[in-house]
């Protein structure tokens, strides 16, 4: 019994996992029994089972003192000692696999980031090209917007781009049902524009914009870029249309032999082309309106009312100061005009030709007419004839 108890006590005493003091004092050739329970290799096993990163030198330089105060270096650590070859090999293999997984994840992350960077750079380049194209088109639009509104829409029937049925090659293609194909449409529009020989200020930016848009459509397969290019192509077509209209108008103006400065507003053909024979005398001399080619109203002593009406509407069509000063209460207007007209036309029939051939107003007879009408000069003493010189001395109200 005692022998059995001794044997059991010895087994208990020799077991390092049950009695710390016995295992610490008893040494044997067995490395498991000679190592205390709180030995650093156990802590190393626990840390190795939890770690996913490889061990660093700082673990051994900063944490040299472990549970029981025994210090180890990296070379003396039992984790790397050949006493546990299977455990060390397993830990090393697991750490290598973990490192391989981490390296694979890092490489995948870096490759994704690099692809994102490359795609972002390409997108920025395409957007920059589109922005440059927009700027060029805006310059052309600003140059064309300086023209008056009479240029735009004045010759809608002269261009094939106003209606889609007028030109078969400009019909929308099957690739895009909403907008015309930018390649064929812009090339056709540019060829059409060159036939009119427009100004280089308009032609050069349009050519550059069309070439850039065609290049972007060919080199950028993205749907967003394609849609942007098609929108820019439609804008370019509109600008080409306005340039063609302006070129047609400039050719028509040159064919009419009008001395106009280039890119100036056209003349109003309804009022200014045929208005040179009807130039007013008041425009040059500051006097009441009197048409040079209109004959002076016929005066007859038997029809004073008719002559009074004609002269009044011709000479004093506007409400000027002459109208209020001549029509005084002392002299009736009918007698005044009849006396003045009688004075002018009684002297000589050639007087009418002389007075109409000159650019002076009928209120101031020429010296020739005065010499011809010398026998009738005493008639100027009448009140009707004295009212005419008073016009120059009367101050303006």
From Swiss-Prot:
GO terms classed as biological process: interphase microtubule organizing center assembly; microtubule bundle formation; mitotic cytokinesis; nuclear migration
Gene Ontology CC terms: cell division site; cytoplasm; cytoplasmic microtubule; cytosol; equatorial microtubule organizing center; interphase microtubule organizing center; microtubule cytoskeleton; mitotic spindle pole body
Keywords: Cytoplasm, Cytoskeleton, Phosphoprotein
Region annotation Disordered: where it falls in the sequence: 1-44, 269-298, 346-397
Positions where Phosphoserine occurs in the chain: 366, 396
Compositionally biased tracts (Polar residues): 22-37, 269-281, 352-369, 382-397
Location(s), subcellular: Cytoplasm; Cytoplasm, Cytoskeleton, Microtubule organizing center; Cytoplasm, Cytoskeleton, Microtubule organizing center, Spindle pole body
Signal peptide location: none
Keyword Cytoplasm: yes
Reported phenotype of the disruption mutant: Abolishes cytoplasmic microtubule nucleation from non-SPB (spindle pole body) sites, but does not appear to affect the formation of astral microtubules. Fewer and thicker microtubule bundles, with microtubules curving around the cell tip. Cytokinetic actin ring displaced from medial region. Curved cell shape.
Biased composition (Basic and acidic residues): 1-13
Protein role: Acts together with mto1 to promote nucleation of at least a subset of cytoplasmic microtubules, by recruiting the gamma-tubulin complex to the interphase microtubule organizing center (iMTOC) and to the equatorial MTOC (eMTOC) during anaphase. Does not appear to be required for cytoplasmic astral microtubule nucleation from the spindle pole body (SPB). Required to establish the eMTOC, and thereby to tether the cytokinetic actin ring.
Subunit structure: Interacts with mto1; the interaction is direct and required for efficient binding to the gamma-tubulin complex. Interacts with gamma tubulin complex subunits alp4, alp6 and gtb1.
Listed name of the protein: Gamma tubulin complex adapter mto2
């Amino acid at each position: 019994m005692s022998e059995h108890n001794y044997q059991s006590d010895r087994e208990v005493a020799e077991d390092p996992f049950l009695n710390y003091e016995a295992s610490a004092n008893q040494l044997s050739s067995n490395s498991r029994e000679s190592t205390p329970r709180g030995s650093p290799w156990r802590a190393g096993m626990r840390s190795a089972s939890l770690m996913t990163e490889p061990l660093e030198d700082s673990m051994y330089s900063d944490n040299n003192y472990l549970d029981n105060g025994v210090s180890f270096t990296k070379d003396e650590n039992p984790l790397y000692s050949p006493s546990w070859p299977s455990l060390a090999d397993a830990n090393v293999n697991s750490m290598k696999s973990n490192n391989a997984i981490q390296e694979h994840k890092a490489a995948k992350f870096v490759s994704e980031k690099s692809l994102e960077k490359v795609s972002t750079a390409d997108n920025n380049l395409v957007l920059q090209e589109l922005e440059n194209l927009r700027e060029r088109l805006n310059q052309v639009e600003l140059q064309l917007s300086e023209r008056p509104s009479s240029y735009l829409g004045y010759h809608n029937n002269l261009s094939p781009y106003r209606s889609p049925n007028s030109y078969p090659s400009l019909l929308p293609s099957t690739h895009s049902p909403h907008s015309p194909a930018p390649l064929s449409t812009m090339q056709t529009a540019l060829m059409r524009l060159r036939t009119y020989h427009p100004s280089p200020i308009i032609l050069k930016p349009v050519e550059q914009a069309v070439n850039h848009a065609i290049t972007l459509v060919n080199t950028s397969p993205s749907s967003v870029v394609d849609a942007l290019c098609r929108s820019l192509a439609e804008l370019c077509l509109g600008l080409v249309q306005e340039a063609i209209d302006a070129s047609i108008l400039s050719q028509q103006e040159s064919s009419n032999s009008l001395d106009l400065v280039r890119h100036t507003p056209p003349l109003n053909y309804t009022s200014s082309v045929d208005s040179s024979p009807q130039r007013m005398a008041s425009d040059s001399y500051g006097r009441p309106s009197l048409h040079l080619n209109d004959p002076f109203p016929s005066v007859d002593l038997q029809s004073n009312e008719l002559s009074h009406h004609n002269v009044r509407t011709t000479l004093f069509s506007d409400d000027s100061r002459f109208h209020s000063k001549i029509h005084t209460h002392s002299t009736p207007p009918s007698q005044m005009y009849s006396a003045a007209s009688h004075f002018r036309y009684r002297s000589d029939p050639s007087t009418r030709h002389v007075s109409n051939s000159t650019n002076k107003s009928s209120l101031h007879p020429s010296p020739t007419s005065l010499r011809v009408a010398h026998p009738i000069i005493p008639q100027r003493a009448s009140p009707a004839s004295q009212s005419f010189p008073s016009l120059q001395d009367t101050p303006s109200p």
